[in-house]
């Protein structure tokens, strides 16, 4: 493991030149304090755990100090926002500090969010507030722990610097780690501004650096796009299976790597509600929970348009056509596993859809239902869960079908089935009210709850002594919270 001054930088994106990003130095925030750090994320950089305790750590990730090898850049991109094209966006408050090359041979972007104004700030102050920084940190880390592809969060640093949103708040910075910060909107920018050479350069960069195995295929760019489709199908399947609602699926928030990216007004479902909208600015429900699947496919079509100089339209359409069947296969497999089933049967899709309909009509807690279903032998668990449903007759019919379906498995004991279920059904998720409680304490200078919640969420499938309060249904005030994009 390394000290902070021993990190090895290899800034591949910066070398693409000024057409792709602008050199900008971070604007420091005052009186920086470390709120929380993720040792597992920092280990991706080969950083020794004790490095986060050093004053230098908070100084670097608050913009006061910088490695001599770092080359902070604000990246340019555009994107479709709520379906309408915005021709010029870019990093308005975040900077790609550089790329660290670790001992495993991986490159990791160090992106500092809240680092101040850039040429793309669009009248903004370039700052991120403490509450949104904490939310992004916790979301990144719990998604990773759940096995959902995501950018990582290294740390959050708070400050005394005031910023104005709806009210006065404190500025903060969050360190985001990802193997690329290229977005769908990055390619869209050069396509729509009619810069074919730059578009080709960026496409080659993505292909060479992030999809090198596709270079061996007869049509490398088509192979790359197909893999992007496949990755997004699997990603969205995991979102839907675990009840994650992103909230702002604009194409500038879609990673070229097929990972969860750019956290804003996200939420995990409390009660199951397929029409849930977590973003209070989404008046039409474009990015509602149930719309995430078609929107992901729409976004892939937007990316495909930017790739038409390299791939035929027919081939792109065929690749996009793979998305829905791939998604459905991944989703059904995940839901099958959540129900403790290991062998595919034709009635599985109906079994899942009937359950979700019953949950929707009864307002059943989505996470706790699956966890409790694996707490006991099936017959006992179903008797316990029966009281959560309004349509008792409907639930009894489903329970009978579920037990018959288990009988078809002939695969191990009841205890083995329960063990399998606990390995895929979390006890703890990031509920918005839990995040809000931690944020409220942090805004008063008490970071203990943020750190405790982070530790609980790092092992979401394992029951932790004394942490039962994090595995409860939310209070009435904490349900169905809609979150502002203001951050």
Curated annotation (Swiss-Prot):
It catalyses: L-seryl-[protein] + ATP = 3-O-(5'-adenylyl)-L-seryl-[protein] + diphosphate; L-threonyl-[protein] + ATP = 3-O-(5'-adenylyl)-L-threonyl-[protein] + diphosphate; L-tyrosyl-[protein] + ATP = O-(5'-adenylyl)-L-tyrosyl-[protein] + diphosphate; L-histidyl-[protein] + UTP = N(tele)-(5'-uridylyl)-L-histidyl-[protein] + diphosphate. The keyword Cytoplasm does not apply. InterPro entries: SelO (IPR003846). It is an enzyme of class 2 (transferase). It comes from the Bacteria. Its cofactor is Mg(2+); Mn(2+). One of its GO terms (molecular function) is AMPylase activity. Mg(2+) binds at residues 253, 262. Keywords: ATP-binding, Magnesium, Manganese, Metal-binding, Nucleotide-binding, Nucleotidyltransferase, Transferase. ATP binds at residues 90, 92-93, 113, 125-126, 176, 183, 262. Transmembrane segments: none annotated. Belongs to the SELO family. PANTHER family: PROTEIN ADENYLYLTRANSFERASE SELO, MITOCHONDRIAL. Nucleotidyltransferase involved in the post-translational modification of proteins. It can catalyze the addition of adenosine monophosphate (AMP) or uridine monophosphate (UMP) to a protein, resulting in modifications known as AMPylation and UMPylation. This is Protein nucleotidyltransferase YdiU.
